[in-house]
Amino acid sequence: MYGLFFEVKPKDGHLKNYLSEVDYLNPILSKYPGLTWIDRFSNLSDKDFLLSFQIWDSEESILSWRQDPEHQKAQMKGKKLHFDDYRIRVGKKVVKYESKKFSYFDEEKRKLESKYIVLINSTNELQDTSFTSFKSINREHAFTAMASTLDFESASKLISNFATLDAIVDATIYEVLRDYSMDDRDQSPN
């Protein structure tokens, strides 16, 4: 499984336009092969940023969605009209903590010196300076906290520090495969 993390800062006065584009694309996206889950979140420490978090079954599915003609039109509108900034990260799920147990994926392939995203889903805001906290736009009492690390050991420690809290629903570590932004396109697939 793969996580796609799209953090976006709409230009002043363009939030409604961006959300209209999202509403238009949602029916297309929901039928797209490979998408297993999506939610959008408001950033609790920086109200100007939103997070779209998606779970896909493969990188190929993500790339296919990226090439969708309607999605490409919306991407161009976003870049030219609606966005001050954005960042996209794609990561492969390597650890999942749920129901008080850890599940590991592709252990032998994991790079110890790589970037990782730690994502903790909870029913309350996680207040820790290691994380950026978000609140779901679509679901009540649904929060996610996201942290970035430069190695697997640090990512594992972050999960271990918070996994036993009552409000934690689950936690996941993603190994970052691509990380690019509006101005830094080096790791963009095209």
Task: Locate the predicted segments by residue.
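Short S/T/G/P-rich N-terminal loop/turn motif that feeds into the first structured element of a domain
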Residues: 1-49, 60-64, 81-190
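Conserved hydrophobic/aromatic residues on the N-lobe beta-strands of protein kinase domains
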Residues: 52-53
